[in-house]
A protein has these predicted regions:
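Active-site anion/phosphate-binding pocket segments in diverse small-molecule metabolic enzymes
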Residues: 2-15, 19, 37, 63, ...
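Active-site-proximal beta-alpha core segment in soluble small-molecule metabolic enzymes
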Residues: 5-8, 13-16, 28-190
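Conserved PLP-enzyme active-site core in the AAT-like
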Residues: 24
Length: 363
């Protein structure tokens, strides 16, 4: 069947972006975040195409199990740890690293007798007030983990709340609190996310890039291209109809757009049922034949309409929704008053994925 919407993933771009991470943090190991199905890019495909990545991070056990079943053998950290003893046993069998953030998790693990050591990170809450132990508990936690022969300590984590903003006072407070809590304690440290890497906030033993790995900028005041990143996802659809609409007639649900003059409009096969946000306003750009055109009328479940005045388009033409050099995902996210993360992760099952430069094709 001919796809209505295609997400084309350039795996070479992701490899390039990993190399860019290494250039920005040359003394750190890289734990690439591939949670939420690789930020919507396909976690298995991403992992298989980063054979030199030091480790990967996912959000939950289910994501880790899927990767192990696909043959991904690199170190794999579960950022939320485990929810039950059964999950802990499964994690041990799959040789996973668990990020432990709460007393109840430690108590759960202390009751187990694993066949081989459980690999644990300890997370400290230094400012997000989301997951993590209070920093003043670090020394007690360190001794407690060291006393367990069946545990292998991987290191310490925290997460920066405001690494993407120009004013770095919050980040500096978090870094100072993390350093003070760990003074005199051993173990590798992991702090920086993509924004932290770009802003050179904390080049610790490990960095954890996420968004920048996929070629989107993690900071609002610098473009991905300016950071040397390459977009990995290009989303496109097709023009499925062309209509001539007289002056004074309205377009779409709610009649929110009225033609100020006779208009030629194009109907594009994409809508909020595919992950194109309903919140996008009139004028949101798309590209047809290299021309930048504006959306008119409300987003429907399956379709949008665009003004074809500036383009001699034809039915069947490809429509770029985001991911070209001139139409990065950040622009669409800004128009929708959301984040690039949400768009990348929000494509639905109706979108067909196509992969370019897959290392498995050249093996």
């Amino acid at each position: 069947m001919t796809p209505r919407i295609t997400a084309t993933i350039d795996l070479q771009a992701i490899r390039h972006n990993l190399q860019r991470v290494r250039e920005l943090a040359p003394h750190s190991k890289v734990m690439a975040a591939i949670k939420a199905d690789g930020y919507g890019h396909g976690a298995t495909a991403v992992a298989r195409n980063l054979p030199d990545c030091d480790a990967f991070a996912v959000a939950c056990l289910e994501e880790a199990v899927s990767l192990r079943e696909a043959g991904v053998a690199q170190p794999l950290a579960v950022l939320a740890g485990v929810l039950s003893a059964e999950e802990a046993v499964a994690a041990q069998a799959l040789d996973l690293q668990l990020v432990i953030h709460a007393e109840w998790q430690l108590q759960l693990l202390e009751q187990l007798q694993p066949a081989r050591p459980l690999k644990l990170w300890l997370k400290l809450a230094t400012g997000m007030h989301r997951l993590g132990f209070e920093p003043q508990l670090a020394a007690v936690l360190y001794r407690r983990v060291a006393a367990q022969a069946q545990w292998q300590f991987c290191g310490w984590m925290t997460h920066l709340a405001c690494a993407d903003v120009r004013d770095q006072q919050m980040s500096q407070r978090q870094l100072a609190e993390f350093a003070e809590a760990l003074e005199g304690l051993g173990g590798p440290r992991s702090i920086a996310n993509s924004a932290g890497i770009v802003n050179r906030l904390a080049e610790a033993d490990w960095v954890r890039p996420g968004l920048m790995l996929y070629g989107a900028s993690p900071v609002p005041d610098r473009s991905a291209a300016g950071l040397g990143l390459q977009p990995a996802m290009r989303v496109s659809s097709r023009l499925i109809a062309i209509k001539d609409v007289p002056r004074g007639h309205s377009i779409g649900y709610g009649a929110t757009w009225t033609c100020a003059q006779d208009m030629r409009i194009g109907i594009v096969a994409v809508g909020y049922g595919d992950g194109w946000p309903r919140s996008l306003p009139n004028g949101t750009p798309v590209e047809i034949r290299g021309q930048r055109l504006g959306m008119v009328g409300r987003v429907s479940m399956d379709m949008i309409t665009v003004d074809l005045a500036a383009c001699d388009a034809a039915i069947g033409d490809e429509v770029t929704l985001w991911g070209s050099a001139s139409l990065p995902v950040e622009q669409i996210a800004t128009a929708a008053d959301t984040l690039s993360y949400e768009l990348l992760c929000g494509l639905t099952q109706r979108v067909r994925f196509r992969y370019l430069n897959d290392l498995r094709d050249t093996a």
